[in-house]
Every structure is written in structure tokens, then in C-alpha cells.
């Protein structure tokens, strides 16, 4: 009798233990590493009134070959599609669910970025390298179309504003970006962004353009992705839908160089607990000379278009390798004259690595004002083609009004800044939709204002995000659970008591 009862209790105990998973927080499909909420953990100060960001600053120059791994980047999705080797970093798509990507652990506030890239060949496959801020400023260094062997795109976005289709420029090149490595780079300063192909400038974007320039710290990202079958606009832009039976598709990256023009430990900005807005500050250092502060969120809706907004300050430079000039915002077929900036020494080729590793200061400034020397320089004629259909005018975000507390000094020293020095009172926040502009049509993704939950075990590439009382503060689900231990102990104790009672 007792033996039968004991056998029953043992079987019951086994059944109870089998019902507990190894990790209660583990998803049903643990093998799928393609989807990641890695970037979803970042809060947007222009969208979330409880968001105050403190981003890790680079504050120096770095070089990575990617031959033996990476010190400054984290894999954010499709781990199986990321490899390091003699040709540097390789991102590979094997099926429609793959999207291999890496994000830097640091941010820069103005500077130089350059990498050697060989794009992935394949219809509907896009090789991309870009910079992006927490509040959705963005500079697309390059987007390479797998279906187009002689063209690449440059682009930019300000605070997620993609209501017009006139930001992208398309550059022809020879030889193909799909058959061999080419250097793609940008130099970002407060008044000018210059895109480079093989050490030669191919596009220059000045502050007077109607959209403005990025004014927030940005991280770097490499990504290889395929267009979705049900997105007709993106399919047309990418040259067709991907055929995965023709894969795998591989993008190669090597010899990355990055220089942060600002010097700091962290970059902080966003919403304070009392509802005030904290302008960008460089903790433990200073912001680059000439920095233009972003407007607080409450000012965005008050901006009105001005005649100055119509100034075309975006020029595509022709070269022997690229005879076709990309689409611009004017419908006038005539040509305009462009005077190269006088600060030509800031557009020379990159220093050798030995020089890069020194502490020599490099201003990288671009003087956009005409000078006597400029009058002696040759004039480059820039043809202007027809604009894209559907282009509409939109109020500018970063250049319509002067910053309320802009520091006019040469260098904005922030070491001993007081809390109220660069603060604006704000009571509203902006809900921003991230809409990616394409060649034909647009793809829209709405970012939710709620704090997402993460199941990713990757190290996050950003430093600190503040959540205030009343908000959900749990960002990550713990990989170690005490539920199983507690439940197991309770069952064991109960079984022991039953056995003791039966034996007495």
C-alpha cells in the first residue's frame, strides 16, 4: 500500500517538473534570431516626454578592419548572417527573414566617417551604411541597389520628416559597386555635409537647404536587407522583389574610419522631470565649434515657411565617373553655377592610419561664404532635372528660427554648464512617424510611444535611458528566473509532508 502511494507521488512530482519550462521568459521560437527589438529600446526625446538620453560619445578617431571581429559594434539581428574574415565584415542574406545588421556602441557629434564597401548583387537586395540619432536625424552614407550595377544613392532625414521625396540623390559610377570595393564617406559639420566616393566629393548639402541639417548625436549602422513582396513602392525603388533561390547575397565592409569632431564622455539631451527641455550638452568635454542647437519639440509646430527656406543649397558634383546628375527639387531645366567652398583643405583624402592615430586637431570646417579666393576658382555647372511627383513643401525643422539659447562662442564649453543654461520650457511632445522615402512610393512604419519589452540578450549600443515614476521601468526580461526554484521547493516540501503523514 505504502509502496503504491510512494510510486504515485514520484510520478506526480515528475509530471509537475515537466510542466515548468527551463526559462519562463523564453519565447516559443528561440531559434529565430532574425527579428530584433534592439533599436526599439531607444527612446525618442521628440516623441516621448519622459525621454532623456545620455549617449556614449566616441570623442576620438578610430579604425577597424573587421578582419578579426569588432570592438565598437554589436550585432543586432540575424547573427548567422554576420562573419568576419580576410575581406572584413560579411553580411549575408540566405532567406526572406534575414536582415543582418550591426550598430556602433558610440555616437558622434559632427565628424568624418568612411568605409570600403562591396555591395551585394541581387534584385531587391539593398546594402546600406548610415548614421542615425535617437530623435531620427539621419545621414545615409550609401545605399547600393543589388539590381543596379552602376548606381548608388545618398540621402538624409531631419527628425523623421519624410513628407517630401526630394532628399535622395542618385550617383552613377564605374566600375560597379557590386563587383569591387569602393570608399564611401561623409564629412558632417554644423553648416555642411559632404558625401565622398573614392576620396572625391560627389554631393554637398549646406545649411540653407529647406530641410536643414542634423543637429543630434548619431550612431553608425551597417545593414543588408531585402524588400517585402507586398510593398509595391519599395519594390519599384529597389528594382524588383528579391528571388531568394538565387542567393545567398553578401555585402562586404572593411577599413572603417571614424572621427568625432566633438570631445566628450557622453552626449545628453531631452526632457527633464520638471517638463523642461535640456539642449544638447557634452558631458566631460565640449561640442564642436559652430554647433547649432536643435529646436525644442514645442517649437516645431510654430514654424512657418519663409522665403529663405526656398534656397537650394544641395548640389551634386559631376565627375568623370558619373556623368548623370541625380534628381533635385527644382523643375527648371536650366543650370545653376556652383562655387566650391574655399576650405578645400577639409576635403582632401583621408590621412594615413599612422597620422589618424595622433591627437592632431582637425577642424573639418567648411566656409560657405564667398571670398576673394573663390572668385578665382572655376565654376562647376550643375544641371537641374525635374522633381519627383508627389513632392510637397514642408516646414523646416532645424533652420526656421534661431535657437533660443544658442551659444555664439567659438567652442560651446559644457564642462561646468548649469542645469538651466540651455533649457527651454516645454509641455508638448511630437509624435513622429518614420517614413522611409523611396524612388517610387513610400513605406511607413509608425513608432509606438509605449516602452517596448526586450527579449534580446545583445548588449545595447547606447548608455543610459531615463524613465520616470509612473512609467514602465522594466526594459529587459531577466535571463535567470526564480519562479522555477520557488515552485519546485514548494512541491518538494508538500510531497515530503504527505509522505511523513502516511508513514506515521
Curated annotation (Swiss-Prot):
Proregion span(s): 480-504
Phenotypic effect of disruption: Leads to increased susceptibility to cell wall-perturbing agents.
Residues the entry annotates as binding chitin: 143, 221, 225, 234
Glycan-bearing residues: 34, 161, 407, 416, 425
CC per GO annotation: extracellular region; fungal-type cell wall; side of membrane
Keyword Glycoprotein included in the entry's annotation: yes
One annotated GO biological process: fungal-type cell wall organization
Disulfide bonds: 43-51
Signal peptide location: 1-18
Residue spans of biased composition, Polar residues class: 316-329
Compartments reported by the entry: Secreted, Cell wall; Membrane
Catalytic machinery residues: 138, 143
Region of interest (Disordered), residue spans: 304-404
Lipidation (GPI-anchor amidated glycine): 479
Catalytic reaction(s) noted: Random endo-hydrolysis of N-acetyl-beta-D-glucosaminide (1->4)-beta-linkages in chitin and chitodextrins
EC number assigned by the record: 3.2.1.14, 2.4.-.-
Domain GH16: 19-270
Protein modification: The GPI-anchor is attached to the protein in the endoplasmic reticulum and serves to target the protein to the cell surface. There, the glucosamine-inositol phospholipid moiety is cleaved off and the GPI-modified mannoprotein is covalently attached via its lipidless GPI glycan remnant to the 1,6-beta-glucan of the outer cell wall layer.
Main location group: secreted
Record bears the keyword Hydrolase: yes
Record's function text: Dual chitinase/transglycosylase that plays a role in cell wall architecture. Chitinase and transglycosylase activities are coupled. Required for the polysaccharide cross-linking at the septa and the cell wall. More specifically, transfers chitin to 1,6-beta-glucan in the cell wall. Plays an important role in fungal pathogenesis via its functions in cell wall assembly and regeneration, filamentation, and adherence to host cells.
PANTHER family from the UniProt entry: GLYCOSIDASE CRH1-RELATED (PTHR10963:SF68), GLYCOSYL HYDROLASE-RELATED (PTHR10963)
Family assignment from sequence similarity: Belongs to the glycosyl hydrolase 16 family. CRH1 subfamily.
Name of the protein this chain belongs to: Crh-like protein CRH12
Gene: CRH12
Amino acid at each position: 500500500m505504502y509502496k503504491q502511494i510512494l510510486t504515485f507521488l514520484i510520478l506526480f512530482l515528475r509530471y509537475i517538473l515537466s510542466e515548468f519550462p527551463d526559462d519562463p521568459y523564453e519565447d516559443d521560437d528561440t531559434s529565430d534570431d532574425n527579428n530584433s527589438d534592439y533599436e526599439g529600446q531607444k527612446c525618442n526625446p521628440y516623441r516621448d516626454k519622459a525621454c532623456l538620453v545620455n549617449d556614449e560619445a566616441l570623442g576620438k578617431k578610430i579604425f577597424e578592419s573587421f578582419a578579426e571581429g569588432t570592438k565598437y559594434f554589436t550585432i543586432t539581428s540575424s547573427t548567422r548572417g554576420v562573419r568576419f574574415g580576410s575581406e572584413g565584415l560579411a553580411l549575408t542574406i540566405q532567406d526572406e527573414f534575414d536582415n543582418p545588421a550591426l550598430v556602433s556602441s558610440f555616437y558622434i557629434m559632427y565628424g568624418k566617417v568612411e568605409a570600403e564597401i562591396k555591395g551585394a548583387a541581387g534584385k531587391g537586395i539593398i546594402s546600406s551604411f548610415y548614421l542615425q540619432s535617437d530623435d531620427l536625424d539621419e545621414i545615409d552614407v550609401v545605399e547600393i541597389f543589388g539590381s543596379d550595377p552602376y548606381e548608388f544613392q545618398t540621402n538624409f532625414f531631419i527628425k523623421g520628416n519624410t513628407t517630401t521625396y526630394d532628399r535622395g540623390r542618385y550617383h552613377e559610377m564605374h566600375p560597379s559597386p557590386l563587383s569591387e570595393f569602393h570608399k564611401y564617406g561623409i564629412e558632417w559639420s554644423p553648416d555642411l555635409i559632404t558625401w565622398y566616393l573614392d576620396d572625391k566629393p560627389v554631393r554637398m548639402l549646406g545649411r540653407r537647404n529647406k530641410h536643414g541639417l542634423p543637429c543630434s548625436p548619431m550612431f553608425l549602422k551597417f545593414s543588408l536587407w531585402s524588400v517585402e513582396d507586398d510593398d509595391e513602392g519599395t519594390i519599384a525603388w529597389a528594382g524588383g522583389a528579391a528571388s531568394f533561390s538565387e542567393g545567398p547575397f553578401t555585402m562586404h565592409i572593411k577599413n572603417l574610419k571614424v572621427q568625432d569632431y566633438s570631445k566628450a564622455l557622453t552626449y545628453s539631451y531631452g526632457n527633464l522631470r520638471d517638463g523642461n527641455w535640456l539642449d544638447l550638452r557634452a558631458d566631460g568635454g565640449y561640442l564642436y565649434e559652430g554647433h547649432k542647437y536643435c529646436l525644442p519639440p514645442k517649437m516645431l509646430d510654430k514654424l512657418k515657411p519663409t522665403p529663405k527656406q526656398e534656397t537650394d543649397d544641395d548640389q551634386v558634383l559631376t565627375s568623370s565617373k558619373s556623368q548623370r546628375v541625380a534628381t533635385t527639387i527644382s523643375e527648371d531645366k536650366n543650370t545653376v553655377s556652383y562655387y566650391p567652398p574655399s576650405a578645400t583643405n577639409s576635403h582632401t583624402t583621408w590621412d594615413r592610419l599612422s597620422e589618424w592615430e595622433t591627437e592632431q586637431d582637425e577642424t573639418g570646417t567648411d566656409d560657405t561664404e564667398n571670398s576673394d579666393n573663390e572668385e578665382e576658382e572655376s565654376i562647376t555647372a550643375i544641371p537641374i532635372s525635374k522633381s519627383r511627383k508627389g513632392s510637397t513643401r514642408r516646414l523646416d525643422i532645424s533652420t526656421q528660427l534661431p535657437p533660443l539659447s544658442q551659444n555664439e562662442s567659438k567652442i560651446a564649453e559644457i564642462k561646468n554648464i548649469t542645469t538651466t543654461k540651455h533649457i527651454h520650457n516645454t509641455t508638448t511632445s511630437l509624435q513622429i512617424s518614420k517614413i522611409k522615402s523611396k524612388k517610387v512610393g513610400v513605406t511607413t512604419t509608425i513608432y509606438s510611444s509605449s516602452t517596448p519589452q526586450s527579449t534580446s540578450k545583445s548588449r545595447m549600443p547606447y548608455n543610459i535611458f531615463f524613465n520616470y515614476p509612473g512609467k514602465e521601468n522594466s526594459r529587459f526580461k531577466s535571463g535567470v528566473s526564480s519562479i522555477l526554484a520557488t515552485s519546485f521547493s514548494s512541491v518538494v516540501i508538500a510531497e515530503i509532508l504527505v509522505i511523513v503523514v502516511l508513514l506515521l
